[in-house]
Amino acid sequence: MGYIIKRKVIYRNDRTGKKIKLPALFTESGIVISHLRFLATKQGRSQSWKEKSVFSVKLLLDYIHVNENTFERTVDLLQSFSDCLNVGTIDYNQMHDPSGLFWKRRDVKYANNILAHITLYTDFLARQKGYEDNRENPFRNATLAEQKLNWCAYYQRQANVFLNHLSSTTEAEKQCIKIRTITGQLQPKVENEKVKRFPEDKFVDLLYRGFIRPYSNISMHENERLDYKSIAISMLLNKGGIRKSEFCHIYSSDITLHPVNDGALVRIYHPSFGSSPDPQYKNRETYLKTKYNLLPRTKYQLSERLYAGWKEPLLIDSQYYFEVIFSPVSAGKDFLEVYKKYLKYQRVPPPKLAPHPFAFTNQKGEPETIKNFQRLHKRAVERIGLIPSKNEGTTEHGHRHSYGYRLAQFGFSQVEIQKAMHHKNSNSCLVYIQPTSDEIVEKMKAIEALW
C-alpha cells in the first residue's frame, strides 16, 4: 500500500563538508529526490516557505495516489486536483469521502498559494536534464512518484497548463502572461475594514500593568515585579516599528548609546550577511558558526526552538543592517532606560557551556524565542482586560500597525514612512496607515462643521 510521509534529512550535493537540513518526502518508492534538490536550490527562502512547498507537493502526491487509474490525461487530474483544493473532497450530504482524503474547502488565497508552490516545483522539474526519460511510460501506467511528477512538469512546460494564480484580471493584463489551462480561482479584493493596530491608550498599561513577572506582587520593588525584557521588546515593536521576528536577531553589541539624542541606537543586522561584531570574521554566519557553533536563526527548522524568520527589510548600509527609528524620538531614551534595568537586574547570562551573543534571554540564559514572547504578551494583554486577537490589534503585530499609523498622523510622507518601516516597496506601508471608515466619517464631519 502506498504512503507519503515527511521527514527531516541531511542533504549534501558534493564531497565537501557543506550540508544542510531539509524537509523531505518519502513514498513507498523511496525519497522524492527531485523535490529535495529543488529545495536545496532555494536556500535564500525561509524555512516556512520550504515547509509550505513540501506540504503542497505532498497534497498533490496524496491526490495522485488515491486516484490511481482514474485519469487517462494528466491535465484532467491536475484540473480535478485544483478543483478539490477549492471545494474540498467531502460529500456533506452523505457525510462521506470515498477517497479518504477528507479535504475541507480551502480559502481561495490559500488554495492558490498551494498551486503556486507546485508550479514553481514543476517548472524546476521541466528544466532538469533527463526529465524526458521519466516520461517513457504513459501517466496512467507510471509507477514511481518521480515519474508522475515529471508528467505534471511535462504538461506544465508544453502548454502552460498548470495554473495562473493572479488575483485580478487587471494584474493579468499588465503582466501579459499566457493564461494556463488550469487556473486558480480569482480572489475577491477585500480592504480590511478593521485596522489591526494596538490601542494607543492601552500601551502604557500593557507595559507597566501587563508585563508582571511570575510570583510577584504589588508590594515588591519594580525591579523585581516588572518584566523589563518584555517591556523592552514591546517598545521596540510599538515605538520602533520592528517586526516581531526581528528582536530575535539582535546581539547585545547591537544596542548602544545614540551619539546625538542620548537615546538608544539599535541596529538590526541581516542574520547571515550582516557585519560581524568581531572584525576577524567575514559576516555573522561565519561568526556564529566559528565562535559559538550556532547557525543564523533563519537556518534552523521551523520545529526547532531557535528558529526565527526574516522578512527581508530594506537595509541601509553595506554592512547589511538597518537602524531602528523611534517614534516619538524620546521613546529611544525610554527604551534605553528599560534595557539598562533589564541588563542590571534581570537578564540571565548565557550558560558557560552554551554561550551566544543574543541580547534577550530566557530564564535559562538561552536566546529568547518568538513563541515565548507571544505567550508573555498574550498574558499581559489579558491582565489589562483586553482580548488577544489579531482583528483587535492586540497581538504582537498590532504594534507595528500602531507605529505606521502614528507616523501618518504626524504628517510623514509615504516615502518617509517606507524608510522608517524599512519596506523595499513604497506601497507596502499603505496597509499600516489606512484609516477606518469611522475615522473618515469623523474627519468629514469636522470639515463640514467649518462650512
Where on the chain are the PLM-derived regions?
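DNA breakage-rejoining catalytic core of tyrosine-based enzymes
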Residues: 151-212, 276-290, 318-330
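Short, basic (Lys/Arg/His-rich) helix/loop patches that form interaction surfaces
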Residues: 64-67, 218-220, 350, 365-366, ...
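Catalytic-site neighborhood detector that most strongly recognizes the C-terminal catalytic loop/helix
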Residues: 421-446
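Conserved tyrosine-mediated DNA breakage-rejoining catalytic core shared by Y-recombinases
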Residues: 215, 250-335
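Charge-rich, intrinsically disordered N-terminal extensions
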Residues: 1-180, 439
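C-terminal secondary-structure termini that scaffold catalytic or DNA-interacting sites
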Residues: 448-451
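Short, charged phosphate-coordinating catalytic segments
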Residues: 128-132, 237-262
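Basic, Lys/Arg- and aromatic-enriched nucleic-acid-binding interface segment
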Residues: 209-239, 244
